[in-house]
Regions:
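Phosphopantetheine-dependent thiolation modules in NRPS/PKS and related acyl-activating systems
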Residues: 1-18
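Cys-dependent condensing catalytic cores that perform Claisen condensation/acyl-transfer
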Residues: 21-256
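Channel- or pocket-lining gating/hinge segments that regulate access to a cavity or pore
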Residues: 85, 255-272
């Protein structure tokens, strides 16, 4: 990205034999032809994300007040009911904004859509556009859409009693519709599925997309993943399980590791 060279250092694990190059024919080679992303730290493009990584920053910030009031739910005592000892995470900004007219979606429907659908649609289209596939070229094309997602915070925000249930509720708040929303909005005719395998959802979506490409089920594949932290409930649940880091930092493989830090983000790649 931007002229920087990344050196890949081969690592040989004991007891693991590398796959022979001849095991994959030239016709089976799959390449990334487009990508887009939105990550914490203002990383709204692959180039911005690369610069952010090189800066050494981590993007972890206090919980914004437009999500929930951390002062109400924070307590360092893990045994306190309906409290979380985590008050920081990696958040992306602007999830409330959406260009609904560009995608032919009414304001009333857009207002009831899970923000994860909106962000995934924008980032997914950004990846397709980066691959040279604008809206006019996509209609009717056999492009598959494979989205990994395991978070449905949006449902927990609905008021009790069904008062907010409307004509778009069934499709606008269901995680299963994430991939279908992209396919429908852009007129894509390939396979379309949302995959939930918890933390590995996006990786499994990538694996399924490659299998579908090789089987001929689609000519190209849009693969993405999205995660937005819209409710405090997930923080409370993972705090009770003592999964979260009290210091708000991931220190993987370190003796100082004390849990993990939650984070938002959305990424997409186009495979051919």
């Amino acid at each position: 990205i931007r002229g920087r060279r990344v050196l890949r250092v081969p690592v040989r694990r004991r007891g693991v034999r590398p796959l022979p190059v001849s095991a994959t024919g030239a016709d089976d080679v799959i390449v990334v032809v487009g990508m887009d992303c939105r990550f914490p730290g203002g990383s709204s493009s692959p180039e911005a994300y690369w610069d952010f990584l090189c800066s050494g920053a981590d993007g972890v910030v206090p919980v914004p007040y437009d999500r929930w009031d951390s002062d109400v739910y924070y307590d360092p005592d893990v045994d306190q009911p309906h409290k979380t000892y985590a008050y920081e995470a990696g958040f992306i900004s602007g999830v409330e904004y959406f260009d609904n007219a560009f995608f032919g979606i009414s304001e009333s429907e857009a207002g009831q859509m899970d923000p994860q659908q909106r962000v995934m649609l924008e980032v997914g289209y950004g990846a397709l556009a980066a691959a040279g596939l604008g809206k006019e070229r996509l209609v009717g094309e056999g492009v598959g859409v494979f989205v990994g997602c395991c978070n449905d915070d949006f449902k927990s925000l609905a008021p009790a009693g069904g008062k907010a249930i409307g004509v778009y509720t069934a499709t606008s708040g269901d995680v299963a519709i994430l991939a279908n929303r992209i396919s429908f909005s852009l007129g894509l005719k390939g396979p379309s599925m949302t995959i939930n395998t918890a933390c590995s959802s996006s990786l499994v979506a990538l694996d399924v997309a490659m299998l579908q490409l090789r089987s001929g089920s689609c000519r190209a594949a849009l693969v993405g993943g999205v995660n937005l932290l819209l409710s405090v409930e997930g923080f409370i649940a993972t705090s009770k399980a003592r999964m979260l880091s009290p210091t708000g930092r991931c220190r993987t493989f370190s003796v100082d590791a004390d849990g993990y830090c939650r984070g938002e983000g959305c990424g997409a790649v186009v495979l051919k």
